[in-house]
Amino acid sequence: MVAMAMASLQSSMSSLSLSSNSFLGQPLSPITLSPFLQGKPTEKKCLIVMKLKRWERKECKPNSLPVLHKLHVKVGDTVKVISGHEKGQIGEITKIFKHNSSVIVKDINLKTKHVKSNQEGEPGQINKVEAPIHSSNVMLYSKEKDVTSRVGHKVLENGKRVRYLIKTGEIIDSEENWKKLKEANKKTAEVAAT
């Protein structure tokens, strides 16, 4: 009876083109008869665990939205690239991607993008596009003292929490900087609208 069950299991496995000696990485052992219990089969219980591959795992919150990482830089900061093939170059951050901790720095890490033509008579184009850099590969840069520094946080007398450069003590989050950034964003929005 046990032999007949094993034969039917092997035939069903072969019809599914599965190996009859393993199931999800766990070996299948035939049901053995205990010498003490004549006629009653004993089964070995084993736990079958499927592991997700590293590239299949996605960090998500319970509501299935992506986890957003905190970054030490913001849009408008002047940074210096500290590693990679663009090492040593200085630029301003134009965009931030919080889900994968990457930033786009103006005129740095340019990649060529080939664009097909839309119409028959029109030729295709080769565009230069700024590619993202991981935020750990950039460091805040002081234009006045020409030095890179880590970022620190402190509370001013008026109760505002600001970021500053640890080496120089220069405050990054001043109101003038934010006003300049907002004006620049308005200008680019007006240019894009026209």
Curated annotation (Swiss-Prot):
Keywords: Chloroplast, Plastid, Ribonucleoprotein, Ribosomal protein, RNA-binding, rRNA-binding, Transit peptide. One of its GO terms (biological process) is translation. The keyword Repressor does not apply. SMART domains: KOW (SM00739). One of its GO terms (cellular component) is ribonucleoprotein complex. It is found in: Plastid, Chloroplast. The keyword Membrane does not apply. Its main location: plastid. SUPFAM superfamilies: Translation proteins SH3-like domain. InterPro entries: KOW (IPR005824), Rib_uL2_dom2 (IPR014722), Ribosomal_uL24 (IPR003256), Ribosomal_uL24_CS (IPR005825), Ribosomal_uL24_KOW (IPR041988), Translation_prot_SH3-like_sf (IPR008991). Residues 1-50 form a transit peptide. It comes from the Eukaryota. GO terms for molecular function: rRNA binding; structural constituent of ribosome. Belongs to the universal ribosomal protein uL24 family. Part of the 50S ribosomal subunit. HAMAP family: Ribosomal_uL24_B. One of two assembly initiator proteins, it binds directly to the 5'-end of the 23S rRNA, where it nucleates assembly of the 50S subunit. PANTHER family: MITOCHONDRIAL RIBOSOMAL PROTEIN L24. This is Large ribosomal subunit protein uL24c. It comes from Pisum sativum (Garden pea).
